[in-house]
């Protein structure tokens, strides 16, 4: 899933960069428009699978059930066996349509939290002017994640998460309570997050949430906690001003 602003220097790549690459021609929409490239990529994966390598393939930028069905049809046409078929949940459209997407016969769904947050909040995380309001723990993002995990559980589809959010302890606690199957983390956070997950999964008080009332209560708790953290950041502890006469006493 490479955008036009990311591959412009590659040999044979189009030289024109789209005005808005983030919302442009990439992901599954590009693959379906160029079936010869798409099939070549899948055949390379098939070759690895036929040699006994175990892996899964997930398709990015899904916004419709039709895209999943078309990708699945090509996947089956090439007789790709022993390869898990999955989708990225990185657009609000995919989150909304998750029930129908699961019914297409997917094996797993993986959250792309970086893009899901950007698309949901209409925020460019690379823009310094709006960094203060870019937040994967935003109420709207969490509600989508919760809904997708619960639907995947019902349909027997595995759920996972990638992106930076999986390295945040507060997000991990939320995900474990929702019942997510796997979490991808940054290498430097792997030890801390692994220990946290072990604690959460062995803590008798931490149980998966299974009903609407508990889900609503948990979301409210996360929202309240997030607001308290932001409030603390906006109102730091007052700094004591030391008079000149006292400075001499301190440093002597």
Where are these regions (language model features)?
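Conserved alpha/beta-domain cores
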Residues: 1-222, 226, 234, 242, ...
């Amino acid at each position: 899933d490479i955008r036009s602003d990311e591959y412009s220097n590659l040999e044979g790549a189009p030289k024109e960069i789209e005005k808005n690459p983030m919302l442009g021609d990439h992901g599954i929409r590009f693959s379906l428009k160029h079936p010869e490239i798409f099939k070549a990529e899948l055949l390379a994966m098939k070759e690895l699978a036929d040699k006994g390598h175990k892996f899964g393939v997930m398709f990015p930028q899904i916004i419709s059930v039709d895209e999943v069905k078309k990708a699945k049809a090509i996947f089956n046409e090439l007789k790709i066996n022993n390869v898990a078929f999955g989708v990225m949940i990185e657009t609000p459209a995919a989150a909304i349509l998750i029930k129908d997407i699961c019914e297409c016969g997917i094996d797993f769904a993986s959250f792309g939290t970086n893009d899901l947050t950007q698309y949901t909040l209409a925020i460019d995380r690379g823009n310094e002017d709006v960094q203060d309001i870019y937040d994967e723990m935003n109420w709207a993002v969490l509600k989508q994640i919760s809904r997708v995990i619960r639907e995947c559980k019902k349909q027997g589809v595995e759920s996972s998460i990638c992106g930076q959010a999986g390295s945040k302890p507060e997000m991990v606690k939320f995900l474990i309570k929702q019942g997510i199957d796997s979490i991808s983390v940054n290498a430097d956070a792997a030890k801390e997050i692994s220990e946290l997950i072990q604690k959460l999964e062995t803590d008798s008080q931490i149980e998966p949430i299974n009903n609407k009332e508990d889900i609503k209560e948990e979301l409210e708790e996360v929202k309240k906690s997030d607001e308290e953290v932001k409030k603390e950041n906006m109102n730091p502890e007052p700094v004591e001003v030391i008079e000149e006469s006292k400075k001499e006493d301190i440093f002597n």
